[in-house]
Amino acid sequence: MIDRYTGKEMGHIFSLENKYAIWQEIEVLACEAQAELGTIGITREEAAWIRAHANFNRAEVDEIEAVTNHDVIAFLTNMGSYIDAEVPHGSAKPSRWVHYGMTSTDLGDTALCYQLTQACDILIRRVQSCAKICKRRAFEERNTLCVGRTHGIHAEPMTFGMKFGSWAWELKRDLDRLRDARKNVAYGAISGAVGTYSSIDPFVEEYVCEKLGLAHDPLSTQVISRDHHAYLAGVLATVAATCERIATEMRALQKTDTLEAEEPFRKGQKGSSAMPHKRNPITAEKICGLSRVVKANAQVAFDNVALWHERDISHSSAERVAQADSFIALDHMLTKLEFLLEGMVLYPEQMKANLNKTRGMLFSSKVLLALVNTGITREEAYKVVQSNAMRVWSDIQQGMDGPTFRERLEADPACTLTKEQLDTIFDPWSFLTRSKVLFERLERLDLD
């Protein structure tokens, strides 16, 4: 991922330094397990020496890999040189026990899954923070009236707090999915060339995985099956889609013609090189753009599931790009989403103006039901309501200041509703008498 979107914490997790540090820890733990097992000759003293002297140098690893064309062998060679550097001349080299009975993928796959759990922990924290902001702001804006839209068209009144509440619930589901995906990918495997433990005792796998906080794969091939990784990638794509949904709503509400909400615009910020008046929703647009990357990378993960026989390497090159990019992009998205949610500026007066923009047609469903209650059929009531609404639409489309929807109903003999009935109907809060239950449910939402 390019530096522009790489956060320090997430970037470190997918750095070579972190990967090599995890590799080193796995190799040391494997030596300690072998010493405890006591079946291959390594002593506890040698394992302790390996623990104390194990090290690596990234630049040196790169130099060795330029010759070997094999990253694991290059790393092991470099690590071994540090382990043996202070061994007395003529003594047996402790490094001979490093990687004993293991294959490269035992190291690489176990380390990768550990990295992915580290990365998941960051995303879980960020999603949790965004969800808590949404829950708090939902209650702050529970009485901020706005228009609800379906198909982009004004539908019925609602409150802006309901928007925040909906996002809080969706982020909670993402939080649950991320935690489940983390558990699903938290596996290690140290089982040899094709998973048979032909040259290594299963105890080593169990020992290393327990120390790392991983479960041991019950039956791996040479690799940990990629359905684990595909499931995680699918969850990342879902979280990205949630971010995109919120950001898309932000963009739509910030349009000049709507202007009910606006993302933070900092002092000194510029909107356009050519048009100084512009205040563009660039944060929300960035979130939408990066969502496409994360969603597309999920397809890569699903394509990586079908490997040849017990393993091929076709997944490796794709994973090196797609996994890091997805986590780094989503981390950036969530960081920006948190900024957007916390700093979102709302314009209640503009919301009120938009509520009145359709001249009362928002109340058509209430009028329909009230007419049905007078005893006429639904079809007859629908005809009365629609015919008057279409006249209002026509006035709006032609830029005319014609009668409001209520005024047209009052002038229509087919509408038998009284003034008192219409007063009750044309109250936007009449739509929200039962919305209290939504906030009672939201109050019980546990985001810890």
Language-model regions: role of each:
Residues 139-161, 260-264, 268-272, 277-278, ...:
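Glycine-rich cofactor-pocket loops
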Residues 1-191, 197, 201-207, 216, ...:
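A helix-coil-helix interface module used to build multimeric assemblies
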Residues 11-15, 60-62, 269-289, 311-325, ...:
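Short beta-alpha connecting loops at secondary-structure transitions
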Residues 207-223:
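A short, charged helix-loop
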Residues 32-33, 115-127, 236-245, 250, ...:
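Alpha-helical support elements that line or immediately flank enzyme active sites
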Residues 293-376, 384:
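Long, amphipathic alpha-helical stalk/connector segments used for oligomerization, subunit docking
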Residues 228-260, 267-329:
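A conserved active-site cap/scaffold subdomain adjacent to cofactor or substrate pockets
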